[in-house]
């Protein structure tokens, strides 16, 4: 890391720079320009890449989908983000080795047809940064150490949840590289892996080993991509078991329009950001069936109770779910018109099939996968999650939303704490 020991992250004061025009939403630069690799150039990844580039950092954004990268290069825009312009200084590539090694130049040549054909992804898969090892998938790329000639200072993970394990495996630190020399990874992807039932930071740790835990952070909170793209006020939290890392991530991302708080309950932050997507699908069903504000308020409240029950059973702190990554993200995703998961639930309530609703949205609906993982975790740990159970039944067992509502409302009487 520029000007610092590889083991340390610089402390800073978040001083607003008062003499900048209102359109320039940045802080007094407390960090020297950092070399940042963003893995995943879907809507969230490219907005975060542009955010960091506009703060003065050197940013490379990678995606497995050649057509996505070439479109971004040619238009500096994204079809799902009207009016958004990619920061001019963001370097875009489909070459993973280029993305993680700043000693290599990023090719500016147009991506050839043979490369685009090798990456046989439809638009929905491209947004997901699908990484299943099919033809055209990148080779492994060892990330140079922090402080080396080409080493990035930070890696931001913005791929869909089902691609995170592959990224961790492809970018595994060299066997002889101490954890303290490994660039920190900031996980901005939300989800729970279906096979391992691990959240995303846990997935990376399971690939690299426990000694790397302090090199992993999570950025999460109520943050619609389209509003971050428009530089509307947004507040999130940076969580890590390493307080110096959470402070570093705070400083890296924070502006006077993108406020970041630090946290140390990584598990709670990740579970909050993942489980709320399942509850948001239920809220969308509620609104699609026109059940009223009373029903939505009850669903959000009881959904939060389910999140807390599962989180505490897994070792998270209950108070984390009252914060930005829990209640904050839950309210936004259940009530906001920009929520994919809420929209997905609304479409189901109005008669669309699961596949029709997914196709109409055209982007990843993380709650679809998380419903399966959350239910499996609840069964494994003996946690009662009736809303999650009914969402799972609608999505994966063909149950109608009307029948799910009837079963939820027909449950036996019990104390609220249950």
Please state what every model-predicted region is.
Residues 2, 31-85, 93-94:
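NAD(P)+-binding Rossmann beta1-loop-alpha1 motif at the extreme N-terminus of oxidoreductases
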Residues 88-103, 138-152:
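Short acidic low-complexity segments
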Residues 97-98, 148-233, 249:
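Rossmann-like NAD(P)(H) cofactor-binding subdomain of soluble oxidoreductases
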Residues 105, 112-114, 122, 132-134, ...:
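Asparagine/serine/threonine-enriched low-complexity, disordered tracts
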